[in-house]
Amino acid sequence: MEEWVEKYRPKSLNDVAGHNKTKETLIEWIESFVSGQKQKPILLAGPPGSGKTTLAYAIAKDYAYDVIELNASDKRNKDVISQVVGTAATSKSITGRRTLIVLDEVDGLSGNDDRGGVAEIIKVLKTAENPVILTANDVYKPALMTLRNNVNLINVGSVHTNSIPPVLRKIALKEGFEIDEKVIKTIASHAGGDLRAAINDLQSLATGGSLEVEDAKELPDRDSEKSIFDAMRIIMKTTHYDIATSATRDVKEELGTIEEWISENLPKEYLKYKDLANGYDYLSKSDVFLGRVFRRQYFGLWRYASALMTAGTALAKEEKYRGFTRYAPPSIFTKLSRTKGTRQKMKDILKKIALKTHTSTKRARNTLDYMVVIFESNPEVSAELVEYYELTKEEMEFLTNKTITKNIFSVIAGKKPKVEKEIPKKKKTEEVMPIIPKRPKISELPKEPLKEVIETIEKSVENADTKEKEKKDPKKQATLDSFF
């Protein structure tokens, strides 16, 4: 299937939305070449989807120039640039027409595959007879400092959100789709000024048969996720190691998340079984290294995991796949979002079981499996378990169903009245007045209590003295009793 971005790319500057000042500058620049006046190459700098490449192709079409392009998915080292760009910069095309050279995303030049690329570009620019247009997302990278001194820099801003709906409406009409205006506006608002992303989103929704407002609302916010989409495009389309490994360098996502993205989109891109099998083989090896990083806390393995998931999957295919591919966020994220409430309920139940059994929630899961079997077969025992673990009616319906839950709670309800009747009886028996000893009257006391007490004390002292003498008597043989 042909990409709508390419199919409906403006053929003329008049068809390009916005960028009026930039278009005027480009027209003056190209007309200087037409009149035989050599000009400095132009570097168009701006965010992805702002129309940099489209502007270059549109002006080439308007002035009948053939285009030779090298982009981020191509190898762009010193030799390639010298052979392809160097030759084209000083000669006419095979049709006899002059050539416009487009070097796309020059800020992506890096690694061994692009070694010497920037230096060779500068060399070619100084001797170029034909017009050269370069594009870059981040023109202020240190590697491009010398390059900036050899070009005329033009900043291309993002497409205004209000300029996107007319373009989408026009494309939808030509493709025969009737789309609600709310859907078009939702797509435009999610694009974040990236017209290319908006067109891709429109094609994704249209070809997927989901043109409702709710479907459009689920589109990723390109302001935060456009980098990951660009990375997917480069990894899936390129066959060069360094280009693939550098694709995720500026992506603000964790390596595990990038792995999920690649896993989700591999079957969408790799149509040959052999390529798909090789791609997943490299991805599985990446997952092994990623697991070792987290288990052993040895982050030196991080680079191997990254290389295997990017360059490994990129080089797994025998050749590049052409045409449009609908890349999508990992479905696991959508499933996790939808099941968030369910997982929270399960988490709460496992916490209750873990608290009572003095185990972890992981082990509590094993206990829960047996409990569910009991719930389905024995209401009486189930009632005791429910009371012990303090499970609610809602939690029981989540674990079983309404019928089983109703039976168990009816057993619990049948027990409660008996317990309530016994409690008052127990309270009555417990509330008995304490026995208070009767206080004797003064007339009943002994007449001479003091004399009796003194006699008792004297007898005790005499007995104690006698025992002490027996212990000290050396003639008397000591027995065990003497030690007590």
Swiss-Prot record:
Annotated TM spans: none
InterPro entries linked: AAA+_ATPase, ATPase_AAA_core, P-loop_NTPase, Rep_factor-C_lsu, RFC_lid
Residue ranges of coiled coil: none
Region listing for Disordered, in residue ranges: 463-484
Binding site for ATP: 46-53
Function, in words: Part of the RFC clamp loader complex which loads the PCNA sliding clamp onto DNA.
Protein family according to the UniProt entry: Belongs to the activator 1 small subunits family. RfcL subfamily.
Protein name (database record): Replication factor C large subunit
Gene: rfcL
